[in-house]
Curated annotation (Swiss-Prot):
Gene3D superfamilies reported for this sequence: Globins
Signal peptide: none
Taxonomic superkingdom: Eukaryota
Keyword Hydrolase included in the entry's annotation: no
Expression by tissue: Red blood cells.
Globin domain ranges (all copies): 2-142
Cellular component terms per the entry's GO annotation: blood microparticle; haptoglobin-hemoglobin complex; hemoglobin complex
A Gene Ontology molecular function term of the record: oxygen binding
Function description: Involved in oxygen transport from the lung to the various peripheral tissues.
Source organism (scientific name): Aquila chrysaetos (Golden eagle)
Additional detail: This chain occurs in hemoglobin A, which is the major component (60%) of adult hemoglobin molecules.
Pfam families, sorted: Globin
Protein's name in the database: Hemoglobin subunit alpha-A
Length: 142
């Protein structure tokens, strides 16, 4: 999926607003994913999955940190996320569909906290970006 110049601008603008909330927004997206799609919990058997868990907050911060890294290298996401792609494909063996599920939950979190920012055009750009990140993370599965 190719991001247009306008998509890239939209995504960068969204992340300037949310980057200071990485831990909270990431944790909220994970909690939503675990609640809405319970089978995703199987990848976190060692985590305390309760609301407010330090483990979920820490992992949420990592998730949003990776998204920020992708934004910062939006023209070379594959290079920026290569090690993360290796980890998820070869060691963790996360089902690729889970990246899409988490992306949907992340969109909901952005919509809740920044409804005026998430216009239909920005929503489309952010969705394309999250799909592109998912594609990068699953590229090494093949």
């Amino acid at each position: 999926m190719v991001l247009s110049a306008n998509d890239k601008t939209n995504v960068k603008n969204v992340f300037t607003k949310i980057s200071g909330h990485a831990e909270d927004y990431g944790a909220e997206a994970l909690e939503r994913m675990f609640t809405t799609y319970p089978p995703t919990k199987t990848y976190f058997p060692h985590f305390d999955l309760h609301h407010g868990s330090a483990q979920i907050k820490a992992h949420g911060k990592k998730v949003v940190g990776a998204l920020i890294e992708a934004v910062n290298h939006i023209d070379d996401m594959a290079g920026a996320l290569s090690k993360l792609s290796d980890l998820h494909a070869q060691k963790l063996r996360v089902d690729p569909v889970n990246f899409k599920l988490l992306g949907q939950c992340f969109l909901v979190v952005v919509a809740i906290h920044h409804p005026s920012v998430l216009t239909p055009e920005v929503h489309a750009s952010l969705d394309k970006f999250l799909c592109a990140v998912g594609n990068v993370l699953t590229a090494k599965y093949r």
